[in-house]
């Protein structure tokens, strides 16, 4: 877009009058984060085609192509990506997208740390909490995300994922790598979200200690 303050000196199609404030302008030779990319209208995504393929894109005014050299990092939910991928009108984008799957947390101890961080930044930081509440919520969430193994207990699998050694207590328990190899790459992509778990905690928290 044009910087209105500079129109007194330059014409509208002069490069010096252009306001280089867009995402691609600011992220040139850097990293551009695109939040919820696949919810955006297709017209918004068009500049990304030439920016990623040819290293330039057209601005909103009558200027020559602007250079771009950087990385575009977009994140989205699985369902939105599947809908975008299945639309044949988006074939030009699919060849330029590299998928990095980010599963939910599969370690109970790390899930608890996430809850504590969320609670410390909320109005519930001073509210009383019964012992074991966060541990139970974390175990419930992680159990919903991991795949049930064959010839072994899913509870033992959860404990192994958390770094425990069960050789002396559960002879059927497998190693961490054996569980991961059997589960495949999609483990952790489904199940209860951390956002949902925090909503549950916010509802059951005891606001009144008396």
Spans of features found by a protein language model:
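Conserved ASCE/P-loop NTPase catalytic core
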Residues: 1-210
